[in-house]
Amino acid sequence: QQELDGVMLDDIDGALWAEEIIEAARVGEIPRMKRPIVAVGVDPSVSEKPGDETGIIVAVVDGAIRDMYKRHAYVLADDSLQAPPEIWAKVLAATAQRFGGAPIIAETNQGGGLIKAVLTGIDPSLKVLGVHSRFGKAIRAEPVVLAAQQGRVHHVGYWPLLEDQLTTWVPDETRKSPDRLDAYVHVLTALLVKAPEGLYGGTVRA
């Protein structure tokens, strides 16, 4: 259930994620991994609309599990923020550096070139891996939603703003752009569904 002004509400009709699914898989820490692969998903704010955020989500899987559909992903951080490119780029770089130079997963047709451009002047060693999709947000999210329903997506601790967006965004109805959700889908798709070329991962402890 969602809480709004102290009143508990049922799950939102049409929302892709249910709160009980997230809660059932929540953990306090990640398990020991043989070959952790960490990546940072980003959905950059490229518009001047007030309230638009840049989604920055970090997750890890055990790369020793070769079958991606058997992997479990652990969401480690939500560093999303509302800021102009010169600010969110610094936060994005700091997030990637904090996790051992973790690769950044970005959609090529939604600010991918901008991300590479702004990061070059901050830390040119950071790798930006582009992903491209011809489908809408809801279709892209489906494999990640399925993984969550299978109990394979674990939030390490609580990420209230991210979780609120996941459980309230309704395709074709919610007007606000789901920036955190998009970044979440980018990184979890790369780790659980289809890895972009060049994905090697960062480190959990940096």
Where are these regions (language model features)?
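Mg2+-dependent endonuclease catalytic cores in nucleic-acid-processing enzymes, primarily RNase H-like
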Residues: 11, 15, 39, 57, ...
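Short coil/turn segments at secondary-structure boundaries
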Residues: 2-7, 15-21, 107, 156-161, ...
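ATPase catalytic-site recognition across NTP-hydrolyzing enzymes
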Residues: 1-45
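An active-site-proximal beta-strand-loop segment
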Residues: 42-56
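Short, conserved, surface-exposed binding loops centered on an aromatic residue
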Residues: 29-33, 47-50, 94-98
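Charged alpha-helix within mobile-element recombinases
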Residues: 163-189
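Acidic two-metal-ion nuclease catalytic site recognized across multiple nuclease folds
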Residues: 187-206
